[in-house]
Amino acid sequence: MAATQEAETATNGAGHTPMMRQFLRIKAEYPETLLFYRMGDFYELFYEDAERAAKLLDITLTTRGESAGAPIPMAGVPVQSVESYLARLVRLGESVAICEQIGDPNTTKGPVERQVVRVVTPGTLTEDALLEERSANLLTAVAPGPKGRFGVASLELSSGRFSVLEAPDQEALTAELERLRPAELILPDDDQTPAPEGGCVAQRRPSWHFEYDSARRLLLRQLGTHDLSGFGAEELHAPVTAAGALLQYLNETQRAALPHVGALTVESRDEAITIDAASRRNLEIEHNLSGGTEHTLASVIDTSVTAMGGRLLRRWLQRPLRRRETIAARHAAVAALADGAFADVRSTLEGCADVERILARVALGTARPRDLTGLRDALERLPQLQILLGQLNSHRLQALGVELDEHPQTVDLLQRAIIDTPPATVRDGGVIADGFDGELDELRSMSRNADDYLAALEAEERAATGIPTLKVGFNRVHGYYIEVSRSQSGHMPERYTRRQTLKAAERFITPELKRFEEQVLSARERALAREKALYEQLVADLASELTPLQRSASALAELDALAAFAERARSLDYVQPELADTPGVRIEGGRHPVVEQALDAPFVPNDVRLDNRRRMLLITGPNMGGKSTYMRQTALIALLAYAGAFVPAQRAVLGPIDRIFTRIGAADDLASGRSTFMVEMTETANILHNATAESLVLMDEIGRGTSTFDGLALAWATAERLATRIRAFTLFATHYFEMTALEQIHPGVVNVHLEAAEHGERIVFLHAVRDGPANQSYGLQVAALAGVPQEVLKAAREKLRSLESGDGGDTGSAQLPLFGPEPVFPPPAQPEPEPDPIREAVENLDPDGLTPRDALETIYWLKAQCKE
């Protein structure tokens, strides 16, 4: 019988033991959650929970007697290793209610009192063993608002970072959820807002949790204020509603106050460059298109030496700012560190504990001894960091030096209270240092002197009994004893009382040894109780200093992120970008930050110039020639600049950018029933509706998924709208050579191409961007590189010659126009005649960018040209 069914009869107690009635009563409160029910040194699961856990964790499923006439399925995990099991369950999207023994088994009649102390869910993790150290673990709530708006609230319980924002529509909400990538999402049960894809666990909560007035009261109580104006949130009804619903969920699952959540950040969409969900995926900022983390921007840029610095750096990359003052301050700080100080800063920070998350556990009362030594070691580094920062010419670094503080009293307390290398938990003692507390020292002394006393007692009893093999010992079951062999046991004094009989020995106790046992065991118990009380008080004392300690933790994270930017600038030859007041993008010698690191050969740098007279670069050239790389590197350079980092270029000047759009690559969206072409058109529509004159737009191969004329017509109309109506700064790559005529029609459209050199039927990609349109597509040569069979290539060449001569033959499948006559496009722009092709090819060569094989093929090609 299932646990949920059994719970219905638990109240009358028929057929159930008292302990099982207790279990069923508690389980009834958490019907959808796995219940870890503490029994001694194990957490046990029963009924359906046991069967589910056995499958998910690959642990043994057994039974425990009978209840209501049926065997009870049971499985269990040791308390000592519970975190590893919780980690596996949470990764599978499960939630676990932790039910602890809160009564004393020695004084309780019947089942010991138990209660659920916490529900572990994917979005409420705080233990290091359950978290990814460089990724935020966010709990996010979404509340629908008026006029199609949405309120979004996010909390990282493991650090206390709490933020809200308002999304104006569904598209913006999707973009924000793609940026945040929450571990758990809270939605109202009466709303049709879809949960995002990608492993996020969605929880549907009662609609009354999303009632504004009660949500606002919860938020005010949490922040300890009577008004939200100081946080800039008083008028944000939907975000406040989301924040209150989030806090209601935490109240139910955590069963504890959250003192480390004392501030609220309102994120304005106008403060940051907007990047929609598709563009964020295409740019591969933290995750590649396969969902992994290799070959991403973060994998190249994040060399931070602390986990909290890495998380902050990734937030900066995910949310490049538009606020010039903040970005300029970061650039100045990176420049000051890059002059040499970054190495000293990083070596001082190396090995620093994750102070943000430690402080969260301090606030929640779950900090362990090694958390406190990690905090102590981190705080001991602050004076050296302050000295280093005081020598640097940067206002932001000077401010960070002040925010670090030195916390001398806290450092002194931790140095006196905790031993250098404490055990993992305080359960068995040995955490508090000698000399910290007189009472504890006295109790420990009594226990430690026991060995000397027992050695003396053993010598006395041997002399008194004349038995040289007599020994005094101890075990946990019977306590202290005097042991002699069976053959000698009949001659013991009357004061000896038999305690235990073994196969070859007898064990006795004497009144003197009994008194000593009571004193020692009492001293040990009292010492352990005293140590636990001292530890709890120590954690409470640290919690009272939470706000200044959190400020220092934030400063440490920011310093680490800035030092990582500086290290990348020095190691990878990045330059400080210039921020201009006038719109435009000018990049000299730009490089793709990720591709550059993945190549064995030197990366071929290229220039980009977009301004009022060059609003659109129409890019042609062969597949594999580097068009997509060229476009992506432009967007990534802009993103890095506005995140506060230096950029891979010889020079970069960037004007204001409000949005970055990328329409690069596409695949079928099978889950939503959308074809590749439908995905492409949806993304294109989003760009045409939302791009502005200050947007950076990347468009790659629009119109590939339909017929040639349809695709060309759509690409032409899209490019015209971007160039003439929207006037966004656009990189537009195409294989439709007819589109190069746009340069002759619309001012601001400029043709550029990716260069390649041909040798017979082979092609060498030079990856250099040149003005003017490409003179051919090299499609057959690329097909040959891909391994297309020679017979197919031969047939393709014959068909190509036929098509180019105008005699394409009657295929019998002419396309009928859907809306009228097929469009008539202006003739494509013709490339200027090349007076000396050999000279032109040599001038355009980049020797450093050629592999040995490319160089050899180029030489053969040049020789063939000379013969002609």
From Swiss-Prot:
CDD domains, alphabetized: ABC_MutS1 (cd03284)
GO BP annotation list: mismatch repair
Pro residues bias: start-end ranges: 823-832
HAMAP family cross-referenced by the UniProt entry: MutS (MF_00096)
InterPro entries xref list: DNA_mismatch_repair_MutS, DNA_mismatch_repair_MutS-lik_N, DNA_mismatch_repair_MutS/MSH, DNA_mismatch_repair_MutS_C, DNA_mismatch_repair_MutS_clamp, DNA_mismatch_repair_MutS_core, DNA_mismatch_repair_MutS_N, DNA_mismatch_repair_MutS_sf
Region (Disordered) location: 803-852
UniProt protein name: DNA mismatch repair protein MutS
Family stated for the protein in its record: Belongs to the DNA mismatch repair MutS family.
Residues where ATP binds: 621-628
PROSITE patterns: DNA_MISMATCH_REPAIR_2
Protein role: This protein is involved in the repair of mismatches in DNA. It is possible that it carries out the mismatch recognition step. This protein has a weak ATPase activity.
SMART domains with a match to the protein in the record: MUTSac (SM00534), MUTSd (SM00533)
GO (cellular component) term, any one: cytosol
Gene Ontology MF annotations: ATP binding; ATP-dependent DNA damage sensor activity; damaged DNA binding; mismatched DNA binding
Pfam families linked: MutS_I, MutS_II, MutS_III, MutS_IV, MutS_V
UniProtKB keywords: ATP-binding, DNA damage, DNA repair, DNA-binding, Nucleotide-binding
